[in-house]
Amino acid sequence: IMPSLVGSEMCIRDSDNTAVDLLEECGNPIYKIASFEITDVNLIRYAASKGKPMIISTGIATIEDLELAIEACHSVGNNDITLLKCTSAYPAPLEKANLLTIPDMKERFGVKVGVSDHSLTNTLPIVAVALGATVVEKHIILDRALGGVDSGFSMSTNEFKKMVIAIREVEQVMGEAYYPEDPWSLSARKDSRSLYIAEDMKTGDIITELNVRSVRPGYGLHPKYLKDCLGKKVNRDLEKGERMKLEYIQK
């Protein structure tokens, strides 16, 4: 029920080939390989052969383990692979997270990345998303009083909701690495500085740092041109408060 409430698909972990067959009969859309099954390349290959997305936790995996697991998927034509950075401790200590592994795995193996988190906070998933994670695994418990093997590091539904909200905010603030001249940026130019006429000037007056100054708003000539203006004569009468322009300089 919970996956449908948060807009995600049900994902069930498989443990052997017969489990894969059963999950296929049930219409399972995604296969999840746990950290402790990372070395079972035959299981990985069989699950991958079904053509469904593969999510693989990496808690105990060496680089060789990951290479073999990815190759097992590729060998049956499955390239839809997501590696989850995972610390195989329950609960997992924050200082062992090593989340910089996430962008490294993405670049090193050319796959999608995510995080499988067993820590006691929502910090790891939020940071992981900022580092490029597209999948987050976090345990949920409806009532801690019920107990259970993972109750000590599972989130309540309310805690999970707060984590999802925070992750969505991270996705918004990350944006893109470029410098657009969008409407917001252009409107903010009014708070920058530019060159304006600071004193009334007559034709032939010499430009100095007193009669042409860098002030707000930012709609005048860029301050970088001040050095090109100093010592030059103006070719017309100018009033205090006018925007300075290069065309006002005598040739």
Label every PLM stretch briefly.
Residues 23, 57, 83, 132, ...:
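Conserved, mostly hydrophobic/aromatic
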Residues 172-251:
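Conserved SET/PR domain catalytic loop and adjacent active-site segment
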Residues 32-35, 57-59, 139-140:
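Short beta->alpha connector loops at strand-helix junctions that form conserved
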Residues 1-7, 11-12:
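Single conserved hydrophobic/aromatic residue that forms the stacking wall/gate
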Residues 13-17, 37-38, 59-60, 115-121:
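Glycine-rich beta-to-alpha transition loops that act as phosphate-gripper elements at the mouths
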Residues 8-9, 28-30, 53, 108-114:
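Short beta-strand/loop segments at the ligand-binding rim of alpha/beta enzyme cores
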Residues 63-176:
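Catalytic alpha/beta core domains of metabolic enzymes, predominantly
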